């Protein structure tokens, strides 16, 4: 009996040590995957470059050599990046305008017409889209031609397609996500269900937040199949009668086969934090856990996820860090 007791104690001790070891490995792996790369807001990522702003300067961080280049621009917000071009909203002159920065030559130009303090530019190739005063504009920076393409806000662009939110274009809908074809100049309504907003597009996939309840949920439309699915949960009730869902629509982004989003409530659907959703598998994975009511701004390119804290919800200077996670690690 004594030997049996000793063997049992040894076995329990071994299990405990293995358990502790696994916890340490897990903690080390998490620490290795998530890295602080700076302080500021509104990060965006393309290729090996991450861009963000602290309101005074634009930061351009190279993932290969880990260098941080700054571009002076007081009153900067909402930067975006594609290839070797940066674009952001600039209020350094006292009048809102869009700044366009060429990385190789370090030269800057401005778009000054039809820009307001709420303009948030998006860039793809040589084309930039933004909204001002409930109108959506397109600029081809290779020709300097600017065109009004719709009535609405929050546009995004992929190749020759632009998506945006509109409450006045579709006579059969109070609110809708619209899609504009640059080549044909034709428009279609992607969805008019619920309260859709902040659309994004990549390839044949259009995503948006339906914010009819609480912080909303994510839906996705495939232009090739003409099918719509829910990416995250609408407001629902769990087996214990508690509400869950409608907590994932505050900030969303898409690139290739991945959607990233912020979840701000601990409920039946999962813990709060930064998530990545795999379109092929239909599975969501928690990348970084946060307490409830923390509003992050994740963006994605290939296996790189970057995020900061939404500046509209920041409580102190401790909340303005920019983080990076390489999903391939």
What are these regions (language model features)?
Residues 50-53, 86-89, 128-131, 162-165, ...:
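Residue position within the beta-strands of beta-propeller blades
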Residues 62-66, 102-106, 140-144, 181-185, ...:
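Short loop/turn segments that connect beta-strands within beta-propeller blades
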Residues 32-38, 67-72, 107-113, 144-150, ...:
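A short beta-strand motif characteristic of beta-propeller blades
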Residues 57, 91-95, 167-172, 211-215, ...:
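Short glycine/acidic-enriched loop and turn motifs that connect beta-strands
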Residues 39-47, 75-83, 116-125, 151-160, ...:
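Repeated scaffold domains used in trafficking and secretory/extracellular systems
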Residues 295-329:
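Blade-level signature of beta-propeller repeat domains, shared across WD40, Kelch, NHL, RCC1
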Residues 21-33:
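Sec-dependent signal peptide cleavage junction
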């Amino acid at each position: 009996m004594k030997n049996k007791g000793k063997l049992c104690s040894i076995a329990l001790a071994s299990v405990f040590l293995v358990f502790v070891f696994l916890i340490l490995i897990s903690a080390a792996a998490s620490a290795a995957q998530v890295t602080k790369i700076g302080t500021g807001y509104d990060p965006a990522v393309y290729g090996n470059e991450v861009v963000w702003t602290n309101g005074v300067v634009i930061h351009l961080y190279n993932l290969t050599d880990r260098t941080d280049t700054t571009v002076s621009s007081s009153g900067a917000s909402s930067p975006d990046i594609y290839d070797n071009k940066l674009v952001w909203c600039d209020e350094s002159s006292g009048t809102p305008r869009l700044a366009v920065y060429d990385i190789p030559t370090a030269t800057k130009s401005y778009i000054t017409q039809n820009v307001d303090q709420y303009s948030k530019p998006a860039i793809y190739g040589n084309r930039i889209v933004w909204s001002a005063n409930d109108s959506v504009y397109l600029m081809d920076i290779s020709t300097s031609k600017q065109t009004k393409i719709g009535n609405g806000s929050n546009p995004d662009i992929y190749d020759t397609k632009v998506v945006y939110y509109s409450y006045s274009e579709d006579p059969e809908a109070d609110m809708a996500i619209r899609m504009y074809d640059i080549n044909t100049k034709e428009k279609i309504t992607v969805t008019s269900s619920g309260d859709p907003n902040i659309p994004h597009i990549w390839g044949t996939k259009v995503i948006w937040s339906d914010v009819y309840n609480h912080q909303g949920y994510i839906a996705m439309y495939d232009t090739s199949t003409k099918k719509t699915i829910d990416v995250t949960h609408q407001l629902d009730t769990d087996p214990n009668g508690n509400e869950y869902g409608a907590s994932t629509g505050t900030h969303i982004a898409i690139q290739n086969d991945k959607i990233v989003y912020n979840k701000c409530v601990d409920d039946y659907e999962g813990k709060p934090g930064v998530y990545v959703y795999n379109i092929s598998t239909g599975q969501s994975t928690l990348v970084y856990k946060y307490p409830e009511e923390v509003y992050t701004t994740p963006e994605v390119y290939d296996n790189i996820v970057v995020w900061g804290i939404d500046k509209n919800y920041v409580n102190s200077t401790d909340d303005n860090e920019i983080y990076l996670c390489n999903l391939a690690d």
